[in-house]
From Swiss-Prot:
Protein name per its UniProtKB record: Competence protein ComM
InterPro entries in alphabetical order: AAA+_ATPase (IPR003593), CHLI-like (IPR045006), MCM_dom (IPR001208), Mg_chelat-rel (IPR004482), Mg_chelat-rel_C (IPR025158), Mg_chelatse_chII-like_cat_dom (IPR000523), P-loop_NTPase (IPR027417), Ribosomal_Su5_D2-typ_SF (IPR020568)
Gene that this sequence comes from: comM
Domain of life according to the entry: Bacteria
Signal peptide range: none
Entry GO MF terms: ATP binding; ATP hydrolysis activity; DNA binding
Keywords, ordered alphabetically: ATP-binding, Competence, Nucleotide-binding
Origin organism lineage: Bacteria, Pseudomonadati, Pseudomonadota, Gammaproteobacteria, Pasteurellales
Binding, ATP: G222, P223, P224, G225, T226, G227, K228, T229
One Pfam family hit: ChlI
Amino acid sequence: MSLAIVYSRASMGVQAPLVTIEVHLSNGKPGFTLVGLPEKTVKEAQDRVRSALMNAQFKYPAKRITVNLAPADLPKEGGRFDLPIAIGILAASDQLDASHLKQFEFVAELALTGQLRGVHGVIPAILAAQKSKRELIIAKQNANEASLVSDQNTYFAQTLLDVVQFLNGQEKLPLATEIVKESAVNFSGKNTLDLTDIIGQQHAKRALTIAAAGQHNLLFLGPPGTGKTMLASRLTGLLPEMTDLEAIETASVTSLVQNELNFHNWKQRPFRAPHHSASMPALVGGGTIPKPGEISLATNGVLFLDELPEFERKVLDALRQPLESGEIIISRANAKIQFPARFQLVAAMNPSPTGHYTGTHNRTSPQQIMRYLNRLSGPFLDRFDLSIEVPLLPQGSLQNTGDRGETSAQVREKVLKVREIQMERAGKINAYLNSKEIERDCKLNDKDAFFLEKALNKLGLSVRAYHRILKVSRTIADLQGEQQIFQPHLAEALGYRAMVRLLQKLSNM
């Protein structure tokens, strides 16, 4: 047989489109031609495959070899096609049994010795192979992450020779499901960060509890050293473990940039904290071959932006659309790549360049403070459901070893109960309610509606802010076991508008 057809998977975001690899051997001057829009790393497969075949004691055909990667208009990159190209050459030269090739897909890079190396984006390939009712063969290096999602359809091998002997029926390859799934163990209780580590700041802890219960975006505002970063880092310890679907979605994104997933706690929600010097591609994704950014790596978890005004304004404004849609689409000349970006945004900032806007520590004028705060656009600040001031601790607080409030485990138990209520009522968490669902689940009596409208007019808030206040009020009512939203719930939600009050105060000075 001079023609062989082998199947593999490309990597396009969290999608893994099918690639059909056609290998043809013909008479003529020996050579190797690769067609089908390959990137440079794919073109280099010629040398890797030749050396791998020879070092695995196979014959490299002294013929004209033509390899077509179809569809031709699909960009291909990386070394993920090395193994299927090698299998195609062996099948076309009758060095292996090709009768069962149509039921397999292959994704792995080849070392010059014939060893298989892992590649990025294996989890999307596994999920796609499952839908196609084919079995996938990968490198042992990817076996741990494959064990998280594979369903008796993924084999792993160490060498090219192992794969050939398996296809010839001479030996068996282990299934990825045979790896001990340490991920099944619940590690959430081993989080060493606890709310009781933080002295005081009970008001901020209350806001953190509300944010965790309703998955609301949260902004901490206050001088340096008051515990803003510590508070934010405790949030993931208050959140429930991810569901299987959420964990698979997050793992699919993570596998695009890592060969090894942390399968010990793969169901724990991610916490991403990029530095304020992060560029647009680093935060939202990008590159010639688009890769996920921090917002996608934080999918189903928390994105924490410390020193918020120090980020470039255009970078922060790029978050506005993903915060609403839960996804980011990166357009290139030859493709549009979509990544998930459903994350909870938590940010911390100082109220002025010196860190203070009142008291003896303040060394800036109201005009300087306003210029500093104007680095943040109004539409971006509108995306925060809660903004709360985290003040300096009162004198004597550091020596106080008394009650520090509820532990993270106690708060987490409350959060789990409240989220169950929300899922039973609307099938989603409060933060994701749309306008119709807000009208249905956040009804107010006439007196309370008038109270809220009066407050909105006084604070000059937008319709988006109105909806966010109602959703926060709904979460507060859920925490208190109330079916109806009442004025105290609205008043507390309005109290979490520290940034609005600060801007009003500065404009009146």
